[in-house]
Regions:
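Short, basic/glycine-rich phosphate-binding loops at helix/coil junctions
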Residues: 48-52, 110, 224-230
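Short, charged, solvent-exposed linker or helix-capping segments at domain edges/interfaces
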Residues: 43-49, 100, 168, 188-193
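ATP-dependent small-molecule kinase catalytic core of the GHMP/sugar-kinase superfamily
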Residues: 123-233
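Charged catalytic carboxylate motif
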Residues: 68, 109, 210
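Active-site-proximal alpha-helical scaffold in enzymes
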Residues: 104-121
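ATP-binding N-lobe of GHMP and related small-molecule kinases
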Residues: 1-98, 116, 120-122, 153
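Short glycine/threonine-rich catalytic loop with a Thr-x-Gly-x-Asp
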Residues: 98-105, 201-206
């Protein structure tokens, strides 16, 4: 067995403004922590998952096929590991189904921790493709607007057509986020299945304009323009 390597990944907000599936930001102070160490055997195993209270989590499984941390870590280990075993401990700091990127935080923290076991770790940007695999299990879709900011921090534009390449955006001075969390849970995969499959041409034009305006406002450090673009269509 090796020493434990610990990694923290912050919570995140996806679908920022009109940036559905393509624009996300990281939140400071709240997140998941994953510990990883080398063990005898092969592949990834999950020793325990603990909740916000520090106790064994009542809902999250240690089954490696049902946990975003182990799914992401296994995808990484399959390509960069040495064939040995890795044990994970997951400590949840993000509430489940809260809209704060809980599954993404676990996936990112796991990949970063396992990456730390390598003699020559990969760069952070190279880890995104593996974290996405964990998020894909939870949400049923290929998008990075939670995993990318959780991995890289800050505000990130994640066009699906360019993945795993993403674009980090500057945040204008004076902008902060106030988070209001209703006492309810929404399953991401179920919520996505309820979405309309199409929109009108005018909605699409309006959406493109607001998203482009938001990106331009960030680049110009124009907080007032950012505010004008943060509305739905």
């Amino acid at each position: 067995m090796s020493d434990w390597v610990s990694a923290f990944a912050p919570a995140s907000i996806g679908n920022v403004g009109v940036g559905f599936d393509v624009l996300g930001l990281a939140l400071q102070g709240v997140g998941d922590r994953v510990q990883a160490r080398r063990v005898a055997g092969e592949g990834i195993t999950v020793a325990e998952v603990r909740g916000l209270d520090g106790e064994i989590h009542p809902y999250l499984s240690t089954n490696t096929q049902e946990n975003t941390a182990s799914i992401a870590a296994q995808a990484f280990w399959d390509e960069h590991g040495d064939g040995g075993g890795v044990e994970l401990k997951v400590h949840k700091g993000v509430p489940l189904q809260s809209g704060m990127g809980s599954s993404a935080a676990s996936a990112v923290a796991a990949v970063v921790a396992v990456n730390g076991l390598l003699e020559v770790p990969l760069q952070a940007e190279e880890l995104l493709v593996y974290a996405i695999e964990g998020e894909k299990y939870a949400s049923g879709g290929l998008h990075a607007d939670n995993v990318a900011p959780s991995l890289l921090g800050g505000l990130v534009l994640c066009p699906q057509i360019l993945l795993p390449e993403v674009i980090r955006l500057p945040v204008p001075d004076g902008i902060s986020a106030a988070l209001i969390h209703p006492d309810l849970q929404v399953n991401t995969a179920q919520a996505r299945r309820r979405l309309a499959k199409s929109c009108s041409t005018q909605q699409w034009v309006d959406q493109q304009g607001l998203l482009a305006g938001f990106v331009a406002a960030c680049a110009a450090s124009d907080a007032d323009l950012v505010g004008k673009t943060l509305r739905d269509v």
